[in-house]
Amino acid sequence: MTRTGKVTVVGAGFYGSTTAQRLAEYDIFDEVVLTDIVEGKPEGQALDMNQSRPIEGFETKVTGQTTSPSGEGYEAISGSEIVVITAGLPRKPGMSRMDLIETNAKIVRSVTEQVVKHAPEAVLIVVSNPLDEMTALAAKVSGFPHHRVMGQAGMLDTARFSYFVAERLGVPVGSVRTLTLGSHGDTMVPVPSACTVDGKPLADLMTADEIEALVQRTRNGGAEVIALLKTGSAYYAPSAAAARMARAVAEDSGAVLPVCAWVDGEYGISGVYLGVEAEIGRTGVRRIVERDLTEPELASLREAAEAVRAKQADVASL
């Protein structure tokens, strides 16, 4: 098998370590680097993952590296083609993503500065919350072209929507196609007009009230998991989404995925990072793919853009 380069995951919490394991098991990279500021944690996790290689049959090497906020240890990420930033505080029950903003902004800023220093050609995939704001901050701090900075949100939200539809109708998840745009938060915009089950419009299978109930459940999908866990937040589905994005970049696949990307004129929206569908390849976002939205859906997307724009401007000053 031909492998491609090096990918780094910053943050060895549940989210980051699970992402690293998924990336290693793809067996398409020469090396997966996992970093964290907790001494020994990434090294121990990397050792554990490497010991799974004979069982799972992958040859990708996993390297763990303890780092410090001042930059020690970051030389391990040098030459990374992709960097996934998962570092930051997770939500707790009762918290919104915005409650994390000040602390996580400092973390994302610090990490991004080290990425610029050691992996200046990397594609950045941001997953730290609040997602849209942290993605915009990473883009600003890095100075990278907008196409090389994107955030993981839409894939996760879309997956949650699809699962809830499949669960409600009792059908295989593979038969369901859904889409969510907008922000990774209160102004998330699930798009019922784009939803089908075995090619049939969702509106033909469920009432408007039933669909709206699933839309609301999707918006609260992360909070529902957190409330059940009591400690920590979701990481199985989020890590699957982040790893899938990284794979699309590594393989230059041209896959069309819902991601947080820079919007510059699409949908009549400009100058903001927002959840949209995008074609993903080696250089990051190749192009935004516009859907034919209903008037209410388009209005909701534009409202989401304005709400996110104001928050992104505030974060830039932190």
Task: Give short role names for the model-derived ranges.
Residues 96-162:
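Rossmann-like NAD(P)(H) cofactor-binding subdomain of soluble oxidoreductases
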Residues 12-13:
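Glycine-rich Rossmann-fold phosphate-binding loop(s) that bind the pyrophosphate
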Residues 142-148, 157-318:
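C-terminal substrate-binding/catalytic lobe of Rossmann-fold NAD(P)-dependent dehydrogenases
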Residues 25-31, 143-145:
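Conserved S-adenosyl-L-methionine
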Residues 37-80, 309-316:
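Conserved N-terminal Rossmann-fold NAD(P) cofactor-binding segment
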Residues 16-17:
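N-terminal Rossmann-fold NAD(P) dinucleotide-binding loop
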Residues 87-89:
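Conserved NAD(P)H cofactor-binding loop of Rossmann-fold oxidoreductase domains
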